[in-house]
A protein has these predicted regions:
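N-terminal capping/small domains of soluble enzymes
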Residues: 2-79, 85-88, 274, 322-335, ...
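A short small-residue
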Residues: 5-10, 170-175, 209
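Feature marks short, surface-exposed loop/turn motifs that line or immediately flank catalytic pockets
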Residues: 137-139, 178, 214, 247, ...
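Active-site-proximal beta-alpha core segment in soluble small-molecule metabolic enzymes
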Residues: 38-205, 227
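Charged (often Lys/Glu-rich) extended helix/loop segments that serve as interaction or gating elements
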Residues: 227, 238, 243-380
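Charged helix-capping and loop-helix junction motifs
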Residues: 186-191, 220-226, 256, 321
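Glycine-rich beta-strand-to-loop/alpha-helix junction loops that act as flexible
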Residues: 43, 176-177, 206-215, 243-245
Length: 380
């Protein structure tokens, strides 16, 4: 779809979100809602580009947040349901959290006991409360993303679950997945059903958390629908899902420019973007993002290592090859850069943040925001 966008006219670097691709994802998610009656909400920890919230709000039921600021953003910019979960809440923020949120999920019974009287006495609206459970079952292989690894701080395990403290609790929440298919969810639900079923039957809702790659091409949507309906019908409860990546998967790009080409045993292209600053998951995961019209390092004739303009020696994006030699001034386009990019980027070395750009059929290219020195200075 980028063929009708003139990359030369875009600021560099920039995050570019194509609303046509975003809408395609939202339509698929809405199909799941219609087939199951489940409620799907956006996990803003993955994607908080609020200029797209009016579009997202046409399809999804609201947002789920991990902090006061995310909750406020969802409340102000989408204006639908606002859920929140945190391993622990700050007392000096909790009154404001209640202002913005209609669902508050607690990580422990300690936190629930600390705040339940405040929630009960809150008069402006009814706030539903939940407890996060730790099913102690996850198929995530990377520990940094696995909330069920040994001695995890996330959620209440069966051994520590206290049924006497459930009075006033409306639902249970679990989040054990990361970029996974519905067969993983089906196996997880068997564990949750077996170990926590006697508590679920007392609830109004069950939240399946995030990590569901629903909009990926190979995702088995029928198994997802069957799994949702199984729990929904068995316990006569509402079901929530809170994907982040799936909402904006493959709908965004990072456009950058080649600044220099040097040789040191191989061709090295220095670009005006940074893995450390602009796409930190590349180093954290790690993974190698795809570039449009590129191949693996030995696939085409002209091979390059792409590096950043920072002082970090390991700020390497990856090794690529191209059918034609790169030149200074060439534009390169990284794929799938809407998620966990804008929400995690930083100004290490004083490297400027990429501009934020949106494309829609109605308005074409819109430059949503450009950053500069004051954005860097104001954080320090």
């Amino acid at each position: 779809m980028l063929n009708d966008i003139d990359l030369k006219k875009l600021p560099s670097p920039c995050y570019l979100v194509d609303e046509r691709l975003l809408k395609k994802n939202l339509e698929r998610l809405n199909y799941v809602q219609k087939e199951t009656g489940a409620n799907i909400i956006l996990a803003t920890k993955a994607f908080s580009m609020y200029s797209t919230f009016p579009l997202i709000g046409k399809y999804l039921k609201g947002v789920t947040s991990s902090s006061l600021f995310e909750a406020r953003l969802g409340y102000e910019e989408m204006g639908k349901q606002v859920h929140i979960y945190s391993p622990a809440y700050r007392e000096d923020e909790f009154d404001e959290i209640m202002k913005y949120c209609d669902h508050i999920i607690f990580n422990s019974f300690n936190q629930w006991r600390l705040y339940k009287d405040k929630v009960k006495k809150y008069k402006n609206k009814k706030i539903e409360c939940g407890i996060r459970i730790n099913p102690e079952y996850s198929e995530i292989e990377t520990d940094i993303y696995n909330p069920c690894f040994e001695n995890s701080r996330m959620g209440v395990s069966l051994e520590n679950f206290k049924s006497e403290d459930l009075y006033g609790i409306d639902g249970l929440h679990f989040h054990t997945m990361c970029e996974q298919n519905s067969d993983t969810l089906a196996r997880t639900i068997k564990v949750v059903d077996k170990n926590f079923g006697k508590y679920i039957k007392k609830m109004k809702w069950l939240n399946f958390g995030g990590g569901h790659h629903i909009t990926r091409e190979d995702y088995d949507i029928n198994t997802l629908i069957e799994t949702i309906l199984y729990m929904k019908n068995k316990y006569e409860i509402d079901i929530y899902l809170e994907p982040g990546e799936a909402v904006a998967l493959n709908s965004g790009f990072l456009v950058c420019t080649v600044l220099d080409i040097i040789k040191n045993g191989m061709n090295i292209a220095i670009v005006d973007t940074s893995a450390a600053c602009h796409m930190p998951d590349v180093l954290e995961m790690p993974y190698r993002p795809h570039i449009i019209n590129s191949g693996m390092s030995n696939q085409y004739e002209y091979a390059y290592r792409l590096g950043a303009p920072t002082c970090l020696a390991g700020d390497i994006i990856g090794d690529y090859s191209f059918k034609e030699p790169l030149k200074v001034g060439d534009k390169l386009v990284f794929c799938d850069m809407a998620i966990y990019s804008m929400v995690k980027n930083n100004t290490f070395n004083g490297v400027n943040l990429p501009a934020i750009v949106k494309y829609s059929n109605e308005k074409g290219v819109e430059i949503i925001k450009k950053f500069g020195y004051e954005d860097f200075k104001s954080r320090l």
